[in-house]
């Protein structure tokens, strides 16, 4: 019941639109159309219906796999991979990820300016 409760609170939360918008911004900032494919295919497999969108988009943008099975103490969490056919991330992917994140934020700022100018007109 807790799983259903947590999932339904994620779906009904105010993060629904921002999560998807963030995924779209990351995909657009990657300048790679296949990132949209990865996001659309893999986001729904994440345990969080909201976190999966930007995470799947970043996995596609970096060309690496993210999430997947992991260990918390003695407990193994069997999470699915996002962009599972790709290789594991390397240290250099942190810098690349930050660059992709910055590009996505520039796109977000441009969108906000356009919206503000339209509302002002």
Where are these regions (language model features)?
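Catalytic cores of Mg2+-dependent Asp-rich isoprenoid enzymes
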Residues: 9-121
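Single conserved hydrophobic/aromatic residue that forms the stacking wall/gate
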Residues: 1-7, 11
């Amino acid at each position: 019941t807790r799983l259903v409760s947590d999932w339904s609170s994620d779906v009904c939360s105010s993060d629904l639109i921002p999560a998807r918008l963030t995924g779209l911004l990351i995909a657009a900032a990657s300048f790679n159309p296949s990132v949209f494919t990865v996001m659309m295919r893999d986001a729904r497999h994440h345990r969080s219906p909201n976190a999966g969108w930007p995470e799947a988009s970043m996995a596609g943008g970096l060309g690496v796999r993210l999430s997947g099975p992991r260990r918390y103490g003695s407990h193994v969490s069997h999470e699915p991979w996002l962009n599972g056919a790709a290789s594991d991330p390397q240290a250099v992917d942190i810098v690349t990820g930050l660059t992709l994140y910055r590009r996505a934020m520039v796109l977000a700022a441009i969108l906000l300016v356009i919206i503000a100018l339209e509302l002002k007109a």
